[in-house]
Amino acid sequence: MRQFIVIGHDVPTDPDAVSLADLPGAGRLDVLCRCLNSAFFLSHDLRDNVRVWLVVGDEYAIRFEGSELRRLNPDERSTAALVRGALAAREKAIGSMAANPSPGVYIRTQSLSGLLESVADDGPLVTLHEDGQPVVDIDPSAEPTFVLSDHHSFDDAETALLAAHADRRVSLGPEPLHADHAITVAHNYLDTDGYNRY
Amino acid sequence: MRQFIVIGHDVPTDPDAVSLADLPGAGRLDVLCRCLNSAFFLSHDLRDNVRVWLVVGDEYAIRFEGSELRRLNPDERSTAALVRGALAAREKAIGSMAANPSPGVYIRTQSLSGLLESVADDGPLVTLHEDGQPVVDIDPSAEPTFVLSDHHSFDDAETALLAAHADRRVSLGPEPLHADHAITVAHNYLDTDGYNRY
């Protein structure tokens, strides 16, 4: 299982504040939609060994389960509708119980801190950083959990949390990448067993 | 200069047939918009050494010039508006003269065949194919022109044209990728000098 945690700093938790005609205006929800696209889509197929967590407002964690997803389409607008549908179900998420508004989509009340603790035993936690270890020095057989940020850098509190939880800081290359592009590169590294299998 | 040619088989040449509220319905224009995003965006920067050609209906070639672009944003909807604006200028493209509806965006009357001839001297022409040579066996110092297709495979006529023009068939990995993801992987290969520079 490959996992990607993407932090959305500015996306509103109120679905009524999300206009599908202006995703950049909805706290750059377009960025998170492209991350979902990169995480799940293959040509004419979905990756079923992938789980994505969107952390919205450090208050809700929306989980997308590749093996269960049925209504994900590649375009940003329809993906945003799925996220908005999850936010609309947020009041049904009570305590640690998640709501499940559509197949493969779950929302629960959870901060980044709680989420990092809950995935701690799943596999190595990896953050991406320009000064990190080159990805080619990392064992591709591990099933990592990557933590990425939207259009903002990690803030101080997140940086401290990640310093406490992350097993590795990794560099994917000399150019700073958008989060969705980073997901694509990470997948390719793992797909090819570290650029050895084509 | 890195170049990407992306063939849009179903995108209408009439801008009035493009609704920004339904990009998948506009011949999967969403796919081409994501290709532009992958080709040009770095985190907080644009790649100025990149040129993208969208071939629409085998009738028009829309050129995006990284060093000149001013109004490209990452989200699909605003990118689609730029493409629609180019299509709206198509009647000003007369003979081999291109129209230039916005900074860095040009449209001219040209088929795929003519375009492949016009870029023949720019660098090696590369197509992506699951049975192609692993990308890691390719010299990353070349400045290639990649040819990709939208959600459809290359048709028979395109396949014949590419067989005549392409210098290499390359595989980026064992999983079949969307065109925009393939562009991201190709960039990363070149950025890292063949996975050697981080």
From Swiss-Prot, chains A, B:
It is found in: Cytoplasm. GO terms for biological process: tRNA methylation. Pfam families: Methyltrn_RNA_2. Keywords: Cytoplasm, Methyltransferase, S-adenosyl-L-methionine, Transferase, tRNA processing. CDD domains: TrmY-like. Signal peptide: none annotated. S-adenosyl-L-methionine binds at residue 128. One of its GO terms (cellular component) is cytoplasm. GO terms for molecular function: S-adenosylmethionine-dependent methyltransferase activity; tRNA methyltransferase activity. Its main location: cytoplasm. Its EC number is 2.1.1.257. It comes from the Archaea. SUPFAM superfamilies: alpha/beta knot. It catalyses: pseudouridine(54) in tRNA + S-adenosyl-L-methionine = N(1)-methylpseudouridine(54) in tRNA + S-adenosyl-L-homocysteine + H(+). Homodimer. NCBIfam families: PRK02135.1 (NF002560). PANTHER family: TRNA (PSEUDOURIDINE(54)-N(1))-METHYLTRANSFERASE (PTHR40703:SF1). Belongs to the methyltransferase superfamily. TrmY family. Specifically catalyzes the N1-methylation of pseudouridine at position 54 (Psi54) in tRNAs. This is tRNA (pseudouridine(54)-N(1))-methyltransferase. It comes from Natronomonas pharaonis (strain ATCC 35678 / DSM 2160 / CIP 103997 / JCM 8858 / NBRC 14720 / NCIMB 2260 / Gabara) (Halobacterium pharaonis).
